[in-house]
Curated annotation (Swiss-Prot):
Pathway: Nucleotide-sugar biosynthesis; UDP-alpha-D-glucuronate biosynthesis; UDP-alpha-D-glucuronate from UDP-alpha-D-glucose: step 1/1. It catalyses: UDP-alpha-D-glucose + 2 NAD(+) + H2O = UDP-alpha-D-glucuronate + 2 NADH + 3 H(+). This is UDP-glucose 6-dehydrogenase. It comes from Drosophila melanogaster. Its EC number is 1.1.1.22. The active site is at C272.
């Protein structure tokens, strides 16, 4: 069997790499219009960072895994084609800011219809709205050549960036949706056969196409909902003296609830959660379900509130002004073990501090400096890109980033931040030295013993400037 994947991004790359590793009898070609991206996949420096990905790619590349810009040949030769292109939120027109923009999916479908010379199984890998498969099939059949048959399947990914390789190797389930026809069942069996090379058959769930499409949106909505739920309680904890970590542990020990995704933080980010919930909201609005749309909108609103609230906590704690103060930002990716900055909470934090006149010293072990500057100078973030460039300095190590700063802000939960020499950091910072732990990963008691004024999420905090004027050292 020959497989083609259109789209060499965060989903297509790791998925095809693991598939090639586990299916030596299958030839997989990953194609993309970007020659630069394909050149990176064929080099020693891959276009995305994902733990374990390098090793898998190097083992399979040019054996049964190929990266190419020759989309036409790959489509012609393939028996099965994954569509794994970006589905961003629309930025203009009907559904602006909510609906998924399916222009890349449509483009891929039209390419397949134009190029295909034999029967194809076409698989939605991208996250799409419910009934998107119907649109793809309409395009394929409207341009169908005589004697060519298409089957459309939905096979959403359930990967978490930073653990994608492990998620693929040890998937708790694989979901395949297809048409409830004899031909549809045969197509499902063929895709299932690929996964059965390494996934137990009982972990492969088959549904109709529409259930599969909605399940992906629902999964991300549920995960984001849990984060917003615990973050909402973090505000209550700060106002009452409760500790959100203790609350989360008590709640998570209930077997009906579980402990995953109950870590309070500065907020969720990434390419999926917000985009998919906005898509779900748009679907609900168009189905005349305003109460359902409002319910899921609150998950987004709470996340934005949490990011703003944390940013304001920094300003208020620093005597209600950060003008001309240097602040170190440790971590810019939306989570650890990835270089992805899409919808990262760090952008909101940095934007707020820059608007208040702060100068920022930023360090992230995997995000390229150019990416950080691009994010902070984007028109949606600032109207003064040159001013931002002057106020932001990117560092190659955390110790240079914190030197002579007034405060240190943890925006990403990188493991290396836990093991930093905080005595050395304290000595190099301006006094009083502040730490704002937006990911709750540090030993706050030890930091206080060193001399830091520590603020975190989900513990009662007080206006430190006022208390200090009374000679009181604030506690967490």
């Amino acid at each position: 069997m020959k497989v083609c994947c259109i789209g060499a991004g965060y989903v297509g790359g790791p998925t095809c790499a693991v598939m090639a590793l586990k299916c030596p009898d299958i030839v997989i070609t990953l194609v993309d219009k970007s020659s630069e991206r394909i050149a990176q996949w064929n080099s020693d420096k891959l276009p995305i960072y994902e733990p374990g990905l390098d090793e898998v790619v190097k083992k399979c590349r040019n054996v049964n895994l190929f990266f190419s810009t020759d989309i036409e040949t790959a489509i012609k030769e393939a028996d099965l084609i994954f569509i794994s292109v970006n589905t961003p939120t629309k930025t203009c027109g009907n559904g602006k800011g909510r609906a998924a923009d399916l222009k890349y999916v449509e483009s891929a479908a039209r390419m397949i219809a134009e190029i295909a010379q034999s029967n194809k199984i076409v698989v939605e890998k991208s996250t799409v709205p419910v009934r998107a498969a119907e649109s793809i099939m309409h395009i394929l059949r409207a341009n169908q050549k005589p004697g060519i048959h298409y089957d459309i399947l939905s096979n959403p990914e359930f990967l978490a960036e930073g653990t994608a390789i492990n998620d693929l190797l040890n998937a708790d389930r694989v979901l395949i949706g297809g048409e409830e026809t004899p031909e549809g069942h045969q197509a499902v069996e063929k895709l299932s056969w690929i996964y059965e090379h390494w996934i137990p058959k009982q972990n492969i769930l088959t549904t109709n196409t529409w259930s599969s499409e909605l399940s992906k949106l629902a999964a991300n909505a549920f995960l984001a909902q849990r984060i917003s739920s615990i973050n909402s309680l973090s505000a209550v904890c700060e106002a009452t003296g409760a500790d959100v970590s203790e609350v989360a542990r008590a709640v998570g020990l209930d077997s009906r609830i579980g402990s995953k995704f109950l870590q309070a933080s500065v907020g969720f980010g990434g390419s999926c959660f917000q985009k998919d919930i906005l898509n779900l909201i748009y679907i609900c609005e168009n189905l005349n379900l305003p109460e359902v749309a409002a319910y899921w909108q609150q998950v987004i609103d709470m996340n934005e509130y949490q990011k703003r609230r944390f940013s304001q906590k920094i300003i208020e704690s620093l005597f209600n002004t950060v003008s001309d103060k240097r602040i170190a930002i440790l971590g810019f990716a939306f989570k650890k073990n990835t270089g992805d900055t899409r919808e990262t909470a760090a952008i909101t934090v940095c934007q707020t501090l820059l608007e208040e006149g702060a100068a920022l010293d930023i360090y992230d072990p995997k995000v390229e400096p150019e990416q950080i500057i691009d994010d902070l100078t984007h028109p949606s973030v600032t109207e003064s890109p040159e001013k931002v460039k002057k106020a932001v300095q990117i560092h190659s190590d955390p110790y240079s980033a914190v030197r002579a700063t007034h405060a240190l802000v943890i925006c990403t939960e990188w493991d290396e931040f836990v093991d930093l020499d905080f005595k050395r950091i304290y000595q190099s910072m301006m006094k009083p030295a502040y730490i704002f732990d937006g990911r709750k990963i540090l030993d706050h008691e030890r930091l206080q013993q060193i001399g830091f004024h520590v603020q975190t999420i989900g513990k009662k905090y007080q206006r430190t400037g006022l208390l200090r004027s009374w000679g009181i050292v604030p506690q967490l």
